[in-house]
């Protein structure tokens, strides 16, 4: 008997210890910052029972600050028994601003049709709006919504849950959903349920969810207009680019995609595919306004001859040797820095506004047709022939003409002043191997500066020659230093139907590079300002 009692006591002791350990483990488990209500509320007369009961649970959820979601929306007014108080409205001289839960009478019954936090109130808690058949849109940004269930919301048209710590979302049987935005969350490949049911989707944005590695868009890729999977882990098996016939905008930056074939796209307007290891990028034949950013992808060639509507390209940091824009008459912005360019053909691009082609292997560049070119940077090349002629009603007329005898190079560049953050514009003289820079002189041989980098003021007229001599040669004797010829005012623009023919200056004597500037337009610091012009 005593042995039996000892066994019972031992078993009870073990059970107590196990229970204590279990309670301790439970206490250490992470808990949500919010608490869902367990109270029961009767559905008000005239309101759909499913809609009210699903939504009142969310409205009664207490957030991490100890405030119910309903109170966060409409402080001091919210009552769970009156759904009309779940919406906050304020009148302004320009109109009414409102956010919260929207109801609408449909077939004699009030139905939940929309939820919007208006960017201004932080809502927290899990969402279960399943079978709310007339729910049309949900907009929640900057909230804390770990999970969301919209299954069988047959009228759901748009979901926007961004930067909300979302880990799982169910959109099963949401047959009419057109827009699915769930970017900046914690979704993984298994966290999106039912996407294959959403055959009407035209806008898909799941960017900034690095754990998404598999994504099946085959149910709606043919009618997609906007696709953004930036900063996700998806790869080549997830997107068939040849099926994206209707797409307007694509962003696949920072993914694992290596092959992009857009040749079947008929109306693409924006393609962003930078910072990923591309094997190739095949562009469509289309005349739509198009901007492309494919910087830092490793592509070795880029054929834009079929993109007649191309107006902006950034292909910097790629080993591309040739770019030809002769079939791109609407080209306005070219950024091709730190490539291996040997040829940059801009003939006929008379709408150019900015060209950056720094640190390449260019020996010549023709921008003479660009009468609106206000920003031109070409340092770090071996340019021997530059003609920059601007003639428009905003900037007036100015010319930069450069001819080289083969012993030095001249470039136009800028840097940002670290103190004022303004632009420092300069002409730069770089001697070839075996030569040295002597000075800048005017056309009469008067010395202007001995600094190879000469800072200039935009929209003033300059006539300068960069003098180079072989190493070891005797110094060149010049007149006393003089200031360059600067006009008081920029020349008035010459408005003609056709661009005026450039006047080629006399070729300087051997040992000099001539730089003739009749006024230079203002050049802004920083990157190119994107200015899209319709045509």
Segments from the language model and where they lie:
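Sec-dependent signal peptide cleavage junction
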Residues: 22-38, 505-513, 530
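Canonical leucine-rich repeat
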Residues: 126-127, 148, 169, 190-195, ...
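A cross-kingdom C-terminal cell-surface attachment/processing module
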Residues: 513-533
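N-terminal capping/linker segments that flank leucine-rich repeat
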Residues: 8-13, 26-137, 175, 199, ...
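Concave beta-strand-loop units of leucine-rich repeat
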Residues: 116-123, 139-145, 155, 160-165, ...
